[in-house]
């Protein structure tokens, strides 16, 4: 980060931090914006060292401007950041990003006017851009595209497979190229022949449209003048390299290389949409996926969507939050609908990582512990149990702490010779006589039982006199052995 942060120093850094991001806003540019711009340039295969000079910033803006109409918010933000940095290098006093863009636009218009005036003043001079250069004899010659450039282009196509970042890479590698150079780059692509056929169809359509808008003038061509290029000439199929150089260096020039490049970029946009079959609705953040990686996948897919910029803005505002995981979604909704992408990424930084998991786990454990403590406290609020001394019979202390003289014998029955644990008072069997009298009958027996009675004898004997049982019979009944539980429960009807 140190090397990236050393782009601005001293007064330039102070001027940079005074510029606001938006007109009337509160946020200003900071050092982290330079670090972010450097990383984005590396993603687009551009040298971050270009940010250190105003000329380098101008070259970066020139490379990014063709893709601004179809680019994502990140690409537009990168262009605006570089434009503001250019004003700082040139010591142009600006207050916000919009004012910086207006200043650069004015400067470009003035530069274009100066170029036109210079061309009108000196028609003998011709422009020279690599790969078309002027040799020692003053002739315009062409230097073929280098093998290193071709290798970089092939590597990008093989690795990225026509992902959205292929277009800025093609624009950077084909700077100043002739139609022949562009065809060489396209011919080096070995695979993806279906995509190449789609690209050829797009080029043929644009060439036919060029021929329709630029009809051939009637009559022969005047001596010393070049014929007007047709669509096939711009595509490099019916024109020679010398004719292409002449058109590009003539006054006024016909930039056949730039025209052909625009056609190729238009075809590449169609291929990118075809090679991105995933819908933006299917881009959802995984439960453990960092928010930054999710945003990268989201905007990469959004870049290939066939929609207007307004629709893409709506998708960004709605789907980016809706398809986030529950942890990030809670944070994003708390920020509100007007939060910027920078605020979202800052708020969700670290969500899903080890630190975040440990923090969430600690909070959950803290809640569980607090719940257990509250339950324990609530359980202790019941009525207090009174203790009673077995020695003196008083409440409030135990027998081992009793100050009264030691009671001899059993504390239950009062007899000597045994202890409470060996006392038989509480071990009386069902039919024994040791049952404690003060407790009454067992709970499974009726306390007051009404003895069943039989109707009087006279009701069956139709008025005959009934005789009372003799005393002799009562004596016999008393002497009979107990053949039932009559002795315990009273008269048993079944025993008679």
Swiss-Prot record:
GO terms for cellular component: host cell nucleus; host cell plasma membrane; host multivesicular body; membrane; viral nucleocapsid; virion membrane. It comes from Human immunodeficiency virus type 1 group M subtype C (isolate 92BR025) (HIV-1). The gene is gag. Late-budding domains (L domains) are short sequence motifs essential for viral particle budding. They recruit proteins of the host ESCRT machinery (Endosomal Sorting Complex Required for Transport) or ESCRT-associated proteins. p6-gag contains two L domains: a PTAP/PSAP motif, which interacts with the UEV domain of TSG101 and a LYPX(n)L motif which interacts with PDCD6IP/AIP1. Residues 187-225 are annotated as: Interaction with host PPIA/CYPA and NUP153. This is Gag polyprotein. Residues 12-19 are annotated as: Interaction with host AP3D1. Residues 275-361 are annotated as: Dimerization/Multimerization of capsid protein p24. The keyword tRNA processing does not apply.
């Amino acid at each position: 980060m140190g090397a990236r942060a050393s782009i601005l120093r001293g007064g330039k850094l102070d001027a940079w931090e005074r510029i606001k991001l938006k007109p009337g806003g509160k946020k200003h540019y900071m050092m982290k914006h330079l670090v972010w711009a450097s990383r984005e340039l590396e993603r687009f295969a551009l040298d971050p060292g270009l940010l250190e000079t105003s000329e380098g910033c101008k070259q970066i803006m020139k490379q990014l401007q063709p893709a601004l109409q179809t680019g994502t918010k990140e690409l537009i933000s990168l262009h605006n950041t570089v434009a503001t940095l250019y004003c700082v290098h040139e010591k142009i006093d600006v207050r916000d990003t919009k004012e910086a863009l207006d200043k650069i636009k004015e400067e470009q218009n003035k530069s274009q006017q100066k170029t036109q005036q210079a061309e009108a003043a000196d028609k003998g001079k011709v422009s020279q851009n690599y790969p078309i250069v002027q040799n020692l004899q003053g002739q315009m010659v062409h230097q073929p595209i280098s093998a290193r450039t071709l290798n970089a282009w092939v590597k990008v196509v093989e690795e990225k497979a026509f992902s959205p970042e292929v277009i800025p890479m093609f624009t950077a590698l084909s700077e100043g190229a002739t139609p022949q150079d562009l065809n060489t780059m396209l011919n080096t692509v070995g695979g993806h022949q279906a995509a190449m056929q789609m690209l050829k169809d797009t080029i043929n359509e644009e060439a036919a449209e060029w021929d329709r808008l630029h009809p051939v003038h009637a009559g022969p061509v005047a001596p010393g003048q070049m014929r007007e290029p047709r669509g096939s000439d711009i595509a490099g199929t019916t024109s020679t390299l010398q004719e292409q150089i002449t058109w590009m260096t003539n006054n006024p020039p016909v930039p056949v290389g730039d025209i052909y490049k625009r056609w190729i970029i238009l075809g590449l946009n169609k291929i990118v949409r075809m090679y991105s079959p995933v819908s933006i609705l299917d881009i959802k953040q995984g439960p453990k996926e960092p928010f930054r990686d999710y945003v990268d996948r989201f905007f990469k897919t959004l870049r290939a969507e066939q929609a207007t910029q307004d629709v893409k803005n709506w998708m960004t505002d709605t789907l980016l939050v809706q398809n986030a995981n529950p942890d990030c979604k809670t944070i994003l909704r708390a920020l509100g609908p007007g939060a910027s992408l920078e605020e979202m990424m800052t708020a969700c930084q670290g969500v899903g990582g080890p630190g975040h998991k440990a923090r969430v786990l600690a909070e959950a454990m803290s809640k569980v512990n607090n719940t257990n403590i509250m339950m324990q406290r609530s359980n202790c609020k019941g009525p207090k149990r009174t203790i009673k001394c077995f020695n003196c019979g008083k409440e409030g202390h135990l027998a081992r702490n009793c100050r009264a003289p030691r009671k001899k014998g059993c504390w239950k029955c009062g007899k000597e010779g045994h202890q409470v644990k060996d006392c038989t008072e509480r071990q009386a069997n069902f039919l024994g006589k040791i049952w404690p009298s003060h407790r009454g009958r067992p709970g499974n027996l009726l306390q007051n039982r009404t003895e069943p009675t039989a109707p009087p004898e006279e009701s069956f004997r139709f008025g005959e006199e009934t005789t009372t049982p003799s005393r002799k019979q009562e004596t016999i009944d008393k002497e009979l052995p107990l053949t039932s539980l009559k002795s315990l429960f009273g008269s048993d009807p079944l025993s008679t």
